[in-house]
Amino acid sequence: MNRDSFYPAIACFPLLLMLAGCAPMHETRQALSQQTPAAQVDTALPTALKNGWPDSQWWLEYHDNQLTSLINNALQNAPDMQVAEQRIQLAEAQAKAVATQDGPQIDFSADMERQKMSAEGLMGPFALNDPAAGTTGPWYTNGTFGLTAGWHLDIWGKNRAEVTARLGTVKARAAEREQTRQLLAGSVARLYWEWQTQAALNTVLQQIEKEQNTIIATDRQLYQNGITSSVEGVETDINASKTRQQLNDVAGKMKIIEARLIALTNHQTKSLTLKPVALPKVASQLPDELGYSLLARRADLQAAHWYVESSLSTIDAAKAAFYPDINLMAFLQQDALHLSDLFRHSAQQMGVTAGLTLPIFDSGRLNANLDIAKAESNLSIASYNKAVVEAVNDVARAASQVQTLAEKNQHQAQIERDALRVVGLAQARFNAGIIAGSRVSEARIPALRERANGLLLQGQWLDASIQLTGALGGGYKR
């Protein structure tokens, strides 16, 4: 070894000695791996439905001002959104608090003390009044003021890892806010279209009740004329009572939905006025392939991902705690026993201090903290993997439901057309004078019943379409 390489080796020896003297780090837990969804999720939907990812404001496709207003009000005033926003602000403040520990700190301090020295204590000579010896005791008024600086050197990256962990939490909270936003929008839209479905069903039931009343009036007239017996009108009366009961049930459901909408949108009035509109037929959106794209379009998956990243940085910070901790301190002050001497140049004092903390034996505290960080990280990864599996299953389940309901709607549409043909035949026979008008009403009631069934199926299809939109991320994009 030559002289040029000998001196650097000697200089590094104390550092190597310090590192060797640190508390030993034990690897007791194995990290889990993050799961990714399959490259493709086969939904077996018609090609017409595979027309891309939903838009971030997918509810605008309904072209319904009432719905848009309700969702905008919910996103602006709902308590859930306020909670999500405050969680982000809290995480940002915590990240800033950790980041400030990585820089130098400078403080100014000043103090004044009036004290009487004890002649029997350690400072006994200062209790004497001997100007020749420089003492003017026993009373002194001493003062100190000046600057104090400190700097914790983050050589091993502990503070940087903690800041990264906090920033990961901020990003996770932001993704959770978007998830809350989509859940709110989806909940409001589902309730709104459920209300519209019940409103349309109410109209059909009123038409059924009208036809039943026509039949009842005809039967009563025939009975009064002695043409029929009273027994023939009993079944119609029972059916009319059932229809009235259904109307009451529908009215109750509509009021419950209105109350839930008021709660979701944080509406300030006790009642909510909605106008009935026709149920739309909006094509559900489903891309041909999901795979990795689903990870970037589901806010809940992004939140879980950032919690994993945050936990990994927490592990780095826990590992850095095993290494020496170095602090620098400096002060520049004026210090005097008498206030009259405080501003003299001779009262100035200054100094620099370098501190080193070396963890040698800590009864396993550092390893316990590291185990906690690793366990929390594995828990975050396991939660992420679970969320990935559930996300893929949500899409597959919602897509299958949309397909099934689409087929049911097609079959129901054919049933309604057949029922209308029966009504047309009855109307033609009535126009020809072959049957009475009550027989036309009897033919209309089954057709109206099928129309009611069709409305319920259409409402279910709309609800499933909104659930599919939510399963696809609701337009969220990283």
From Swiss-Prot:
Residues 1-21 form the signal peptide. Pfam families: OEP. Could be involved in resistance to puromycin, acriflavine and tetraphenylarsonium chloride. A lipid is attached at residue 22 (S-diacylglycerol cysteine). The keyword Nucleus does not apply. A lipid is attached at residue 22 (N-palmitoyl cysteine). Its main location: membrane. Belongs to the outer membrane factor (OMF) (TC 1.B.17) family. The gene is mdtQ. It is found in: Cell outer membrane. PROSITE patterns: PROKAR_LIPOPROTEIN (PS51257). The lineage of its organism: Bacteria, Pseudomonadati, Pseudomonadota, Gammaproteobacteria, Enterobacterales. Keywords: Antibiotic resistance, Cell outer membrane, Lipoprotein, Membrane, Palmitate, Signal, Transmembrane, Transmembrane beta strand. It is a lipid-anchor. One of its GO terms (cellular component) is cell outer membrane. One of its GO terms (biological process) is response to antibiotic. GO terms for molecular function: efflux transmembrane transporter activity. It comes from the Bacteria. It comes from Escherichia coli O157:H7. The keyword Signal applies. Disulfide bonds: none annotated. This is Multidrug resistance outer membrane protein MdtQ.
